[in-house]
Amino acid sequence: AGLPGSCARRCGALVAGPRLARMRIALAQIRSGTDPAANLQLVGKYAGEAATAGAQLVVFPEATMCRLGVPLRQVAEPVDGPWANGVRRIATEAGITVIAGMFTPTGDGRVTNTLIAAGPGTPNQPDAHYHKIHLYDAFGFTESRTVAPGREPVVVVVDGVRVGLTVCYDIRFPALYTELARRGAQLIAVCASWGSGPGKLEQWTLLARARALDSMSYVAAAGQADPGDARTGVGASSAAPTGVGGSLVASPLGEVVVSAGTQPQLLVADIDVDNVAAARDRIAVLRNQTDFVQIDKAQSRG
C-alpha cells in the first residue's frame, strides 16, 4: 500500500533479526526510443515516481539515452554534456541517485557504452561514470565495431551503500563481479538492453542470480522493456539487442526478491545490506577463492 500502481514491491530477507541497514531501490524498466530528449523525459518521470515511492536509488537500463540498433555517434555526448547534466538535474530535483545508460564519443570514431551515476545535491554526490568493459561480440552482433571498451571497474557510494556498476554483457563475466565485491560493493547494478531469442530471457534471469551468488552481493538488474515490433527506422539493425524486459533484484543467496514482466514498469524493493556480510561470512566463497595462473601464459617445466 502507498506505492504507485505501476510499482511492485517485495522485501528480501536472508537472516532473522532487526533491520539495521535497509535501503529502498527502484528499477526503471523503460522502452527507450531514438530521441535523447524524449528519453530524458522518461528518466525524469520514473525518477520522480521512484522518489515518491521512497527509493534512494533508481537504476535505468543500458542505452537509456538512445536505443541500440541505430547510429550512435550522432547522439553521443561527453559525460559533462547536456544529456548527462540533465540526469544530474533530475537527480537533484527528485532527491534520488540515478544510474542510467548513455553513449560518449571517443577519439577513434567509436563511442563508449557508459553509465552515469548521479546523486542529489550541488555538487551531485555521487557523480561518477563507468565505461562498459566487455563488448557484445556475440550472437551475430559486433559491438566492438562501433563501441570502444572501458578498462576500470567502478564502485560508487549511495547513502553509505557501496554500489558496483556493470553493463549488459558484463554479466557473463563472473570475475568482474567478484572484483567489485573485493572493492567493497554490496549491491551491483547491471544495466542492460538484452538481446531477444530462444532462452535469452531465462539466461538473463539465471545470470543475475548467479552473479549475486558469485559476489555474495545484491544484484539490481535493470533491462529495457520488450519493444515488440517497434524496432523500425532508418539505419535500424534487426540484430541489435533492444530488450526483453525481465528486470529483477537478486539477493546475495541468489533468491529473486522482485521481478518484472516484459512491459515498461517501475519495480521497488527493500534490501538489507547487513545480509551481504552475513552471506559472505556463512558461505565464504570470496574468502576461500583461489586465483589461477593463466595456462596460456605459464612456462612449461616438462
Question: Which residues make up each language-model segment?
Answer:
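CN hydrolase (nitrilase-like) catalytic-core segments centered on the catalytic cysteine
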Residues: 80-99, 171-265
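Active-site catalytic loop in hydrolytic enzyme cores
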Residues: 89, 106-183, 187, 195-210, ...
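Short beta-strand scaffold segments in enzyme catalytic cores
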Residues: 101-102, 113-117, 154, 247-249, ...
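Cys-nucleophile CN-hydrolase/nitrilase-fold catalytic domain and related Cys-dependent amidase chemistry
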Residues: 33-36, 44-123, 129, 195-217
